[in-house]
């Protein structure tokens, strides 16, 4: 078993490489946090709720020797709704298109049926190199980490997966994140940069704004609600008649839930929760866009939207 740590780092190649890597894993395995750490800026929303990622987000890592485009997929799981099936389809389509797959497995949780389910799917993809990434290493001691590394090595042997690398990382503590980029780079094809210098994602601004609002709305809600929340930015326009040195961006967005009974959970007593969502997301949006924002939020019911193909399309899935 070859496990990489910082001391075993090899010199960088002189050729330039560019390509796509995708992180897979069950929900809440740390994929979005790792994407943000590698890019150096928030491009994917994170939450301690599973299943928060719904779109494939391309985060772009610029290096002297390479451009690494990270595709952050939803967590693969056994679907219970049409939305769940759509999310799984997104994952499998992404796998077929990337140059390297990173399988994220949390250090603080023993391998379970969900991990085996994904590993079996990966075993069927023969040509694409696969890197096992042991995430959240800051949450365990060295003995637990060693046991997890051995278990992952054994899982690969059992299913016929030849791991290109097994890399322990902590995105939150910034441990071995640069090493991971170093190890992914040689697995990319040689070629020029695919995106301009300075671009960190190809997500449209309206999608990123909607995701930041959804991230704020996910905080502190009960377990059944996260999957019922969708956000659509209806309008994003500079306020007219503002002086050039005091711009203001008007953003009008709708937060959709599935049942009228969920409205009170999102809005909160006397509108306090919705106000908190607005304040938190506005701060993040202003940091992202670099301009003051007026955020107008409304909560609407889209009945059982996760199971309705028409509603899914209208909400961008």
Curated annotation (Swiss-Prot):
Q: What does this protein do?
A: An essential GTPase that binds both GDP and GTP, with rapid nucleotide exchange. Plays a role in 16S rRNA processing and 30S ribosomal subunit biogenesis and possibly also in cell cycle regulation and energy metabolism.
What does the entry list as the binding residues for GTP? 25-32, 72-76, 135-138
Underlying gene: era
- Tell me what organism the protein belongs to: Streptomyces coelicolor (strain ATCC BAA-471 / A3(2) / M145)
Extract the PANTHER family matched here.
GTPASE ERA, GTPASE ERA, MITOCHONDRIAL
- Could you identify this protein by its name? GTPase Era
Q: Subunit info?
A: Monomer.
Main localization, broad class: cytoplasm
Region of interest: G1: 25-32
Q: Where is the KH type-2 domain?
A: 221-303
What transmembrane ranges does the database entry give? none
């Amino acid at each position: 078993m070859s496990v990489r740590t910082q001391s075993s780092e090899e010199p960088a190649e002189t050729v330039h490489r560019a390509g796509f890597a995708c992180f897979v894993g069950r929900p809440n395995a740390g994929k979005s946090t790792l994407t943000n750490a590698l890019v150096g800026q928030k491009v994917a929303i994170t939450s301690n709720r599973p299943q928060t990622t719904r779109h494939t987000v391309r985060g772009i890592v610029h290096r002297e020797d390479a451009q690494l485009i990270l595709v952050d997929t939803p967590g693969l799981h056994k679907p219970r709704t049409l939305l769940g099936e759509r999310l799984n389809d997104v994952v499998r389509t992404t796998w077929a298109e990337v140059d390297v797959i990173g399988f994220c497995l949390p250090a603080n949780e023993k391998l379970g049926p969900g991990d085996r389910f994904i590993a079996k799917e990966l075993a069927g993809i023969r040509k694409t190199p696969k890197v096992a990434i042991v995430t959240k290493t800051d949450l365990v001691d060295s003995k637990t980490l060693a046991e997890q590394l051995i278990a992952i090595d054994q899982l690969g042997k059992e299913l016929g997966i030849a791991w290109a690398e097994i890399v322990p990382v902590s995105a939150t503590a910034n441990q071995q994140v640069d090493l991971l980029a170093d190890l992914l780079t040689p697995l990319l094809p040689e070629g020029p940069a695919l995106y301009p210098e300075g671009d960190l994602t190809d997500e449209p601004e309206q999608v990123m704004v909607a995701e930041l609002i959804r991230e704020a709305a996910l905080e502190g809600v009960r377990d059944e609600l996260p999957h019922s929340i969708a956000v659509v930015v209806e309008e994003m326009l500079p306020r007219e008649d503002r002086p050039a040195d005091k711009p203001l961006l008007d953003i009008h967005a709708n937060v959709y839930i599935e049942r009228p009974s969920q409205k009170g959970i999102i809005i909160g007593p006397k509108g306090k929760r919705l106000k908190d969502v607005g304040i938190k997301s506005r701060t993040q949006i202003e940091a992202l866009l670099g301009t003051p924002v007026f955020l107008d939020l409304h909560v609407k019911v889209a009945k059982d939207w996760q199971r309705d193909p028409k509603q899914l399309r209208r909400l961008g899935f």
